[in-house]
Curated annotation (Swiss-Prot):
Residues 31-40 have a biased composition (Low complexity). One of its GO terms (cellular component) is nucleus. Its main location: cytoplasm. Residues 24-45 are annotated as: Disordered. It is found in: Cytoplasm; Nucleus. Changing V11D: Abolishes interaction with POU2F3. Interacts with POU2F3 in a DNA-dependent manner; this interaction increases POU2F3 transactivation activity. One of its GO terms (molecular function) is DNA binding. In the N-terminus possesses a conserved OCA domain for bivalent binding to class II POU domain-containing transcription factors and to an octamer DNA motif (5'-ATGAAAT-3'). Expressed in many cell types of epithelial, mesenchymal and hematopoietic origins. Expressed in tufs cells. This is POU class 2 homeobox associating factor 3.
């Protein structure tokens, strides 16, 4: 007891754990209440000191857990004391098993009438699909016929429909072959005639006029119904334009 309390650097401890244990043991010895055996557990290891310096006494640990102790179930009536408890539970369990059986029998007996009413619908469905099918009840009372019978659909071709081969090619926007040869021959005649009378001009204005004349000749055909334009008038106008342009270039 003559030892001075150790003072660590930076921390001042009023009382150590060892001194707390000594004081606790001295207090227990003075009161005469030292608990024996495994009923109480004394902490021999040092416990970390708290800031308030309090010491907590551990609770005694019993060998049997609390939820298995008999004292808590003193108010309950055990099955050993009351022998009729098991009989009542067993009877109630048998009653719950016996009641669903009539329900199961009723549910099992109901589908026996269901297939008879269900078989009539496929035959009506087949009768509505197949025209002229017999309505004899003796034939329909047999087993179900699952054979596939394709329904003959009526032809939906309209009366005013014409085949693509009978279309008039002259009304289409594509040029026929005969007209292209005629235009080429006409342009060849014009070029030969102009070369015999006057020399050919290769200036930019004349070439542009020639291209315009060729494009106009490609879009206007003599046998089309959509354009009311005479090809002879177009050819003569193009011819006079080229003649005047050539004269302007050489003048």
């Amino acid at each position: 007891m003559s030892e001075k309390p150790k003072v660590y650097q930076g921390v001042r401890v009023k009382i150590t754990v060892k001194e707390l244990l000594q004081q606790r043991r001295a207090h227990q010895a003075a009161s005469g209440g030292t608990r024996s055996g495994g009923s109480s557990v004394h902490l021999s290891d040092p416990v970390a000191p708290s800031s308030a310096g309090l010491y907590f006494e551990p609770e005694p640990i019993s060998s049997t857990p609390n939820y298995l102790q008999r004292g808590e179930f003193s108010s309950c009536v055990s099955c050993e004391e009351n022998s009729s408890c098991l009989d009542q539970i067993f009877d109630s369990y048998l009653q719950t098993e016996m009641h669903p059986e009539p329900l199961l029998n009723s549910t099992q007996s109901a589908p026996h009438h269901f297939p008879d009413s269900f078989q009539a619908t496929p035959f009506c469905f087949n009768q509505s699909l197949i025209p002229g099918s017999p309505s004899n009840s003796s034939i329909l009372s047999g087993s179900l016929d699952y054979s596939y019978s394709p329904v003959q659909l009526p032809s939906y071709a309209p009366e005013n429909y014409n085949s693509p081969a009978s279309l008039d090619t002259r009304t289409c926007g594509y040029p026929p072959e005969d007209h292209s040869y005629q235009h080429l021959s006409s342009h060849a005649q014009y070029s030969c005639f102009s070369s015999a009378t006057t020399s050919i001009c290769y200036c930019a204005s004349c070439e542009a006029e020639d291209l315009d004349a060729l494009q106009a000749a490609e879009y206007f055909y003599p046998s089309t119904d959509c354009v009311d334009f005479a090809p002879s008038a177009a050819a003569t106008s193009d011819f006079y334009k080229r003649e005047t342009n050539c004269d302007i270039c050489y003048s």
